[in-house]
């Protein structure tokens, strides 16, 4: 997947794109920080 356009899901099995990112708990996908 393209980690720049979509950072990946972090529900259950973490997407490799999420490795250095923050999981957005509400939406269940990865973001650069948790303020979105």
Swiss-Prot record:
Disulfide bonds join 3-18, 10-23, 17-30. Keywords: Amidation, Disulfide bond, Ion channel impairing toxin, Pharmaceutical, Potassium channel impairing toxin, Secreted, Toxin, Voltage-gated potassium channel impairing toxin. Coiled coil: none annotated. One of its GO terms (molecular function) is ion channel inhibitor activity. Expressed by the venom gland. The keyword Glycosyltransferase does not apply. It is found in: Secreted. Selective inhibitor of voltage-gated potassium channel Kv10.1/KCNH1/EAG1 (IC(50)=637 nM). It acts by shifting the voltage dependence of channel activation in a depolarising direction. It shows a 100% inhibition at saturating concentrations, shows fast on-rates and is reversible. It also slightly affects channel inactivation, when the membrane is highly depolarised (>+80 mV). Belongs to the neurotoxin 10 (Hwtx-1) family. This is Kappa-theraphotoxin-Aa1a. It comes from Avicularia aurantiaca.
């Amino acid at each position: 997947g393209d980690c720049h356009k979509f950072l990946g899901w972090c529900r259950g099995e973490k997407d490799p794109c999420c490795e250095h990112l923050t999981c957005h708990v509400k939406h269940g996908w990865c973001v650069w920080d948790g303020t979105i």
